[in-house]
């Protein structure tokens, strides 16, 4: 089944501890930062929340690859009911992590332009961060019992995790099943193409803003345009990113077995992670934000701009060519 399913369990074990511990620590950190009215620490929490979500993306994908790695193996004492329950809680976790990341990024963008804290927005991030932390702990607790029958008790007993017919059918049920039916359910064949259209619109927004910002940093039209002028376009690109993350997760849930079997898929996700981190760099870089019309960016910032263009171009290339390159899936 290719590289990712075979290495999925190992990668998942390495990654999964980062969002679990990270969201707990960052939520507590943000609470005290708000109480002390410390803007510097609040910004640190916003950075952390966004980056933890970025890490959560390959964490969830490697978890799905792990499921396909163990689902049809008879040599492992794995309770599929627990696997599916774990997958459902993990999907809820990454949904709330995405909401936290969206608000955290907006808080950083707003702070860059206005220089103040975000009041109610901060408390909203704190509340969602607490929910995300709780869900992450639950997902981790369930996941830790999958390969350990000696600690399966109560709710975590496989017999109580999901109805037998779901486990036998290989259907995760719950929220995962809802998302699956949203894009593939019944005879509504228009749904997948409709979400594809949304995905293309989102990518157009992302790459359009990426080119405008990167070309300004590289030096195009620097005599007439300040960086602040293009900085205000970032929410448009971020809207495209939100659209693509939502539709992308629906595509993945709808056909995860095929996606994780595609050799080009890990390269797309790696490029996506890089692109999201570089996008954060352009959001919060004060040196770039201070550039006025006629001023040139530093050489290092220009290198970062090239990386930004290349990373999103890589995401687009592998996204389009996944079924055709390296033998498909």
Annotate each predicted stretch with a short phrase.
Residues 1-329:
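Polytopic transmembrane helical bundles with strong interfacial aromatic enrichment
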């Amino acid at each position: 089944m290719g590289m990712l399913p075979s290495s999925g369990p190992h990668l998942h074990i390495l990654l999964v501890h980062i969002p679990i511990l990270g969201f707990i620590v960052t939520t507590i950190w943000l609470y005290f930062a708000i109480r002390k009215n410390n803007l510097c620490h609040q910004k640190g929490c916003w950075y952390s929340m966004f980056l933890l979500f970025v890490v959560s993306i390959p964490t969830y994908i490697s978890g799905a690859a792990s499921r396909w790695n163990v689902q049809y193996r008879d040599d492992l004492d794995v309770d599929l009911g627990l696997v599916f329950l774990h997958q459902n809680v993990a999907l809820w976790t990454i949904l709330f992590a995405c909401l936290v990341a969206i608000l955290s990024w907006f808080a950083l963008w707003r702070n860059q332009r206005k220089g103040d804290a975000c009041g109610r927005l901060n408390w909203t991030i704190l509340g969602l961060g607490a929910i995300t932390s709780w869900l992450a702990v639950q997902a981790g607790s369930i996941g830790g019992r999958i390969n350990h029958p000696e600690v399966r008790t109560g709710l975590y007993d496989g017999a109580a995790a999901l109805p037998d017919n779901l486990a036998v059918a290989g259907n995760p049920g719950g929220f995962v099943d809802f998302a699956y039916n949203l894009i593939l359910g019944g005879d509504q064949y228009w749904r997948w193409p409709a979400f594809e259209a949304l995905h293309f619109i989102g990518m157009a927004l992302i790459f359009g803003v990426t080119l405008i910002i990167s070309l300004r940093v590289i030096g195009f039209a620097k005599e007439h345009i300040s960086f602040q002028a293009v900085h205000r376009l970032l929410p448009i690109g971020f809207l495209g990113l939100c659209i693509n993350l939502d539709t992308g997760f629906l595509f993945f849930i709808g056909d995860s077995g095929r996606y994780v079997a595609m050799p080009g898929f890990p390269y797309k996700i790696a490029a996506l992670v890089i692109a999201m981190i570089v996008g954060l760099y352009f959001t919060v870089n004060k040196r770039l934000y201070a550039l006025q019309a006629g001023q040139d960016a530093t050489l290092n910032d220009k290198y970062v701009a090239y990386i930004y263009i290349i990373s999103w171009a890589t995401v687009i290339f592998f996204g389009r060519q996944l079924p055709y390159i390296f033998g498909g899936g």
